[in-house]
A protein has these predicted regions:
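Helix-to-loop junction immediately C-terminal to a conserved catalytic motif
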Residues: 48
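ABC ATPase nucleotide-binding domains
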Residues: 230, 236-258
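The feature captures the beta-strand-to-loop junction immediately N-terminal to the Walker
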Residues: 33-35
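Conserved structural motif at the start of ABC-family nucleotide-binding domains
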Residues: 2, 17-19
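Conserved ABC transporter NBD signature motif
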Residues: 55-66
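Conserved ABC ATPase signature
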Residues: 132-136, 140
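Conserved ABC ATPase "signature" region
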Residues: 111-128, 150
Length: 258
């Protein structure tokens, strides 16, 4: 699905990423974790082909991003970013409809409206679809933009790819789990998701694989139970922790400060 080799990036002579190799498979939910400044968001932007890097090409569905038709690519790939404008003079539904722009010229089709309503239901924003976007709280705006990204990929294309940079910021526990269940359902249909998260326990619960970063390098990339060990996590985060099994789902449960 996605292959990247020897990704390196520097800014003003400061190394941000160093020789990163990543392969993501069809139907996989990969979660990128690591301390602040590890390079998580930069790596995500690189993988999404939003930033220039060294000459090594990134392969998506056996083609480089440069070889893709730029009108076709948005039907296969979408990205949710951390920074979204706080001043958008549109209704909530109009903001979500922006995700359908690759599908129509000036007037949305009924299929576009249906896709928007479906994504809004998944992110629990239907109730304020006619409200001014600027009147929403931070968490509500976050869910609106998640709906916008999801509706972009609402189509019959096989093996789609979504990138999400800290999609759970400002969300309460209910909506954190609701969003991750939606993403998990997306990958269970043969699609792929690459997500940056800070909550290690949510990563352990939902991820098929975890990529742990520190200072621009990969520390470990494996199944959650292989990455989330006391030795690895305590060292990378420079903070003591205990790892036990979650009694409900048997995933690793990280308890910091112990």
């Amino acid at each position: 699905m996605l292959e990247a080799c020897k990704i390196s990036y520097s800014h003003k002579k400061v190394s941000i990423l160093e020789n990163i190799d990543v392969t993501v498979n069809y139907g996989e939910l990969l979660v990128i974790v690591g301390p602040n400044g590890a390079g998580k968001s930069t790596l995500l932007s690189m993988l999404a082909n939003e930033m220039k890097h060294n000459d090594e090409p990134i392969i998506f569905k056996k083609k480089t991003f440069e070889d893709w038709d730029q009108k076709e690519l948005p039907l296969h790939k979408a990205k949710f970013s951390q920074q979204n404008s706080s001043d958008i003079p549109l209704t909530v539904m109009d903001v979500v409809m922006m995700g359908r722009y690759p599908y129509f010229n000036s007037i949305p089709h009924q299929s576009d409206i249906d896709a928007v309503l479906k994504s809004m239901a998944e992110t629990d924003v239907v109730a304020f679809k006619d409200r001014d976007y600027n009147t929403l709280s931070g968490g509500e705006r976050q869910r609106v933009h998640l709906a916008r990204v999801l509706t972009q990929l609402e189509n019959d294309v096989a093996h789609k790819l979504v990138f999400m940079d800290e999609p759970l910021n400002n969300l309460d526990v209910l909506h954190q789990h609701r969003i991750l269940h939606t993403v998990k359902n997306f990958t269970e249909r043969g699609n792929t998701a690459v997500i940056v998260l800070h909550d290690l326990n949510l990563a352990a619960q939902f991820a098929d694989s975890v990529l742990l970063m520190q200072k621009g390098k990969i520390v470990n990339h494996d199944k959650p139970e292989k990455v989330f060990t006391k030795e690895i996590i305590s060292k990378v985060y420079n903070f003591p922790c205990t790892i036990c099994l979650n009694p409900v789902n048997q995933n690793p449960l990280i308890i910091f400060g112990t």
